[in-house]
Design a protein with these regions (language model features):
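NTP-dependent small-molecule kinase module
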Residues: 1-3, 115-184
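Hydrophobic helix-cap positions at the C-terminus of alpha-helices
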Residues: 4, 29, 57-61, 99, ...
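Residue-level signal for beta-strand positions within conserved beta-sheet cores that form or flank
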Residues: 7-9, 103, 154-155
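ATP-dependent small-molecule kinase phosphotransfer cores
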Residues: 9-98
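Hydrophobic/aromatic beta-strand patches that form the interior of the parallel beta-sheet core
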Residues: 14, 69, 106-108, 157-159
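Active-site donor-binding loop signature of nucleotide-sugar glycosyltransferases
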Residues: 16, 48, 112, 132, ...
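A glycine- and Lys/Arg-enriched "phosphate-lid" helix/loop adjacent to the NTP-binding pocket
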Residues: 72-143
């Protein structure tokens, strides 16, 4: 983020859930370890956040030709709610189509073995509702992300996150720079 804010590119940094005021409220509900939410309600809360986010932040900035960096988006929903919550991936994709959600030009998939990822999450902060799920939940999500990447390798790029932070940053930055150069 700091790197791109120093450059003379028009960039937006955002996240889901939580990239709008409504999204912040939804994020609080979704991540609260005390929340008990059905899989279907979880999906619809995420989609409510997403449509608000796309309508008020993503689409207006795309129209201004800004570069948008979004921490989580449609692939996360397919992985978490599709494989993680055992909801129909086809129905999720149909919902994405119905809502006319833009497909990212590039998705960066930072991959780590599940156990290593959970160790990092534990060190970072108190675990949220998703992070507290059992190991099989996380393994199914990782598997889903890897399957998505194999199906769409021109859009979803896989990076081994077990390498040094500096090397990972360099590798990801090189790819992003290449993509920006190709599109401008």
């Amino acid at each position: 983020k700091k790197y791109y804010l120093k450059k003379e590119l028009e960039v937006i940094f955002t996240k889901e859930p939580g990239g709008t005021e409504l999204g912040k409220d939804i994020r609080g509900i979704l991540l609260n370890p005390e929340s008990s939410i059905s899989s279907e309600a979880e999906l619809l809360l995420l989609m409510a956040d997403r449509i608000e986010h796309v309508t008020t932040k993503i689409n207006p900035n795309l129209k201004k030709n800004k570069i948008i960096f979004c921490d989580r988006y449609i692939d996360s929903t397919i992985a978490y709610q599709g494989k993680g919550r055992n909801l129909s991936e086809d129905k999720i994709k149909e919902l994405i189509d119905i809502l006319n959600l833009p497909i990212p030009d590039l998705t960066i998939l930072l991959d780590l073995p599940v156990e290593d990822g959970l160790l990092r999450a534990n060190k970072r902060n108190e675990l949220d509702r998703f992070e507290k799920e059992d190991i099989n939940f996380h393994k199914s999500i990782r598997k889903s992300y890897l399957e998505l990447q194999k199906k769409d390798p021109k859009r979803i790029f896989l990076f081994d996150s077990s390498i040094s932070e500096n090397k990972l940053f360099e590798n990801v930055l090189n790819l992003i720079e290449k993509k920006i150069h190709e599109s401008h």
